[in-house]
Amino acid sequence: FIAVLFVLMLIALLIQIVIHEGGHLVFGRISGYRFSSFRIMNLMWIEDQGKIKLKHLQVAGTGGQCLMSPPDLIDGKIPVVLYNLGGSLMNIISAAIFALLYAVFYNTTFFSAEMILLAVIGVGFAVVNGVPMRMGMVDNDGHNALALSKDKEALQSFWIQMKISEQTTKGVRLKNMPKAWFQVPSDQAMKNTMTAAVGVFACNRLMDEHRFDEADRLMDHLLEIDSGIAGLHRNLLICDRIYVELIGSCRKEIL
């Protein structure tokens, strides 16, 4: 029975991940966003020249991700709350439905067990993703929605990130994207997690352009200052610094 319960729990987790990312997709579309990519675990569906293609990608700290291309900025603004919280909203809605199904079919052992697991996990997903917090190396949806609602520059940075993601999905390299997207934010602005990501992308663009010395100086600066750089991005910057050092001076104090 324990083994069966474990399998049912894994199935419930997977279903709620799909529901969560589906919520981002549905509420993103309602908000005027266009589909870019949809990932569950390491399976990612992307739009490429009007066709949906399957790719493989694993991102640490996330079970799934739905990325969409944002609408054009109007007076420096775009709708962000529904897109960011759409996953949690869908988890809550589905949890209520599954709880109702449990109440109706509570006499059927395995089905009722799956329904209550789906309801509980749905509520858990809604809380963990909807209540603003930093989860390991990435910020959750609630944290993003809160950051965007407080900072106009962060909102602009969010738009840039989504456009970069859209172009990357289409196979466009960073060095071939608009230079205006990669302006390094001020040290003060870098304290915002969303804006800090643009600084990281600026480093990535310099790396793609093989301007390694400039990239190394910028990465060193960004890693030293008090910033909101997410743990995942910070670790990737460290990896890039190691790479630059290995192909350059190989200074022991750096390595």
Which residue ranges define each predicted feature?
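Juxtamembrane/interfacial segments flanking transmembrane helices
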Residues: 34-36, 130-155
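Small-residue-rich helix-interface/hinge motifs
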Residues: 8-72
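Generic helix N-cap/helix-start motif at coil->alpha-helix transitions
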Residues: 191-200, 229-239
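Residue-level signature for tetratricopeptide repeat
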Residues: 205, 243-247
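Alpha-helical membrane-embedded segments
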Residues: 114-134
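Alpha-helical repeat scaffolds
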Residues: 176-186, 212-225, 250-255
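Charged, amphipathic alpha-helical linkers/stalks
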Residues: 144-195, 199-203
